């Protein structure tokens, strides 16, 4: 399975892709830091700040309703140019069907 990277701000479009190697779920975000400290796209300080901000959102002492998710990627590839989508894509993203993916690749 692939994930396609899309920017919804600045120059909107598809920027690259990667293969999803594995998906892991964690109840405690500090376990993520313990396991993947040197392989996160955030620094340790940024990650701790993200946790702190999440605690403010959910409330200190309250359990987050959904688990923390780690997506392990491989074969990460940045496109040589940004590919504009045919239609608007919401910030939450969308599924890209095979024919649309082929159209993205043709525009590279």
From Swiss-Prot:
Pfam families: DUF365. Keywords: Plasmid. InterPro entries: DUF365 (IPR007176). Gene3D superfamilies: Hypothetical protein. This is Uncharacterized protein MJECS03.
